[in-house]
Each structure stands twice: as structure tokens, then as C-alpha cells.
Amino acid sequence: MGQKVHPTGIRLGIVKDWNSKWYADSGQFSELLNNDLAVRSYLAKKLSHALVSNIQIDRPARNARITIHTARPGIVIGKKGEDINNLRQEVSRMMGIPVHINIQEIRKPELDATLVAANVAQQLERRIMFRRAMKRAVTNAMRVGAQGIRIKVSGRLNGAEIARNEWYREGRVPLHTLRADIDYGFAEAKTTYGILGVKVWIFKGEVFEQPEPQVAAGSSAIS
């Protein structure tokens, strides 16, 4: 089962969290969902050069909070914050509510599966040998602290007539262990022979349940 199902979907509520957090009645659900997809598509195109890994959307009462995880926060913010202000205004216009944008820096992009997959895809588009690209990504991830990594490339590799897939793994990648913190990423490389798919699994360790912090008598917890 762990080999076939999406590594993030099966771990939601265990060691992974949702990328969109909001509540809506049945009549508004589809509208808000399509709005989220439109915002994500716009941000992905607008920030395609900023190495964006993930976009989280929260909708508190009558406003929205968007967290952008990027390896290049300076490109997103822009000179004196001009770019992020323009971005906030455009997203607010799309969503129809006030929007607050947070920038979360990714300090180790070698451990982010989405960025690793995008990097391998870019190398394939530059006609670098796929085995060399996979080996380099695996070596960099293990060097900065990954406990295991697996990379799979599918398509017409090296322009072959018959499509196939090749994969490379180092360390442990326990897909069946639900408490395993496994980051999954996917990217596409557009080559002259067609599209190549790149999948990356990175195992960062096991997450054990932590006790909830106790609230002192007479005080309240604020989330």
C-alpha cells in the first residue's frame, strides 16, 4: 500500500498537515477550492524563478493568510518590499478579501523533495545525463543530513524509442511507516524527445507523538 499511495496524503493528520485550512458550507466549498487552485497557479507562474516549494493558504474570518516556502526569499520580497506588495494586492483582488503574505525561507533546499525534483528536471532539460543528475542530487541530500532518498526518472531517457524508468536510492525510505517523515516532490522536464517525469522521496526521520503542553491554572491557550 505504501508503495502506491501518495506519501503525503496517507500521512495527513499523523505527521503531515493540510496545505489549505478553512471551513465552508457545501454551497461555497467548490468556489473556495477553485479560488485556491487559481491562486496557487498564479503564484507558481509569478514566482517560477524563486524556487518556491510549497504554498499554504489559511482563511480565518473574512481574510486570508498565505505562507510561501521559498529558497530565495529576497526575490519574492523584491527591492524595499515592492514585489511582495504588488503580489499582495493582486492576490487580494483574486480572492476578494484582505490577504497577508508570509515568507518562510528554506535553509536546506537539498532536503526539499520538490526543489530537488525541479533541479533534476532542469538538468535533464540542459541535456545532462540522467544518471549523473540523480547521483548528484542523492549525494547532496545525504551530505546535508537526509536519512534516505529515492529518485525516479521516467520517459524517453536519452531519446530512446521505448519509454522506461530508472531509479536510484541511498539510505532508508520506509514508505509503509506512517510515522516516517517523508517529503515527496514531482517535476516535469520538457525535452525535445518529450516530457520526462521526476519523482523524489526524501526520508528525514521518524516523528513520535509529543505530549501537548499543559496550560497553567487561570490562563488560556491561544492558537
UniProtKB/Swiss-Prot annotation:
Domain KH type-2 residue range list: 39-107
A GO BP annotation: translation
Q: Name one GO molecular function term.
A: rRNA binding
Keyword presence, rRNA-binding: yes
Known role: Binds the lower part of the 30S subunit head. Binds mRNA in the 70S ribosome, positioning it for translation.
Per UniProt, subunit arrangement is: Part of the 30S ribosomal subunit. Forms a tight complex with proteins S10 and S14.
HAMAP family xref list: Ribosomal_uS3_B
- Please report the name of this protein according to its UniProt entry: Small ribosomal subunit protein uS3
Taxonomy of origin reads: Bacteria, Pseudomonadati, Pseudomonadota, Gammaproteobacteria, Chromatiales
